[in-house]
């Protein structure tokens, strides 16, 4: 047998032995599947955190609308407390990308809804007199509604599964509880 043929036969023998070897299969499977499992784990974490922030965001909108609807007259200190309550609801998540707006919407005799007053934290308050489109069934002539709005810009911390920023918004309308409308006094 020539030296080249012997070398080929040796290579073929080693390849056959390698093909029959079973001792390292578990380690190879683990090495192949580990990145997939890490991505699934981190993705579950990021999505779970996004869902929790979305739930808190909705609760914050409900909180500001509920608190404002209990007043007959809201002064500046009261509004500071109402808007501040929303940041407490958002804990433990950062409130830097979070904004909250609370407004009163009044519906005239023709069913046209406009902003009566509006205040905001980390955002822009709505303009007084601005026209608003209400959800179906809410534009009862002569009615006043308290409108709580929140917005949170969620940026996943790891960015493996969710990349970029996602804007999470919530809104709720509530009727004033103790008066036909809630006054807003700047003092």
What name fits each language-model region?
Residues 1-88:
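Alpha-helical assembly-interface signal, strongest on the long, hydrophobic N-terminal helix that forms
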């Amino acid at each position: 047998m020539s030296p080249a043929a012997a070398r080929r036969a040796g290579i073929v023998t080693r390849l056959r032995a390698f093909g029959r070897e079973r001792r390292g299969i578990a380690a190879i499977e683990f090495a192949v599947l580990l990145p997939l499992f890490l991505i699934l784990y981190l993705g579950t974490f990021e999505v779970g955190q996004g869902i929790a922030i979305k739930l808190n965001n909705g609760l914050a909108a409900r909180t500001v609308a509920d608190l404002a609807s209990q007043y007959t007259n809201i002064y500046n200190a009261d509004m500071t407390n109402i808007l501040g309550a929303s940041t407490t609801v958002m804990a433990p998540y950062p409130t830097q990308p979070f904004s909250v707006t609370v407004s009163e919407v009044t519906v005239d005799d023709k069913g046209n809804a406009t902003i009566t007053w509006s205040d905001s934290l980390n955002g822009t308050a709505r303009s007084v007199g601005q026209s608003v489109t209400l959800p179906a069934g809410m534009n009862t002539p002569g009615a006043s509604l308290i409108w709580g709005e929140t917005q949170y810009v969620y940026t996943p911390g790891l960015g493996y599964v969710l990349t970029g920023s996602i804007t999470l918004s919530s809104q709720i309308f509530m009727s004033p509880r103790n008066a036909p409308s809630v006054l807003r006094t700047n003092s």
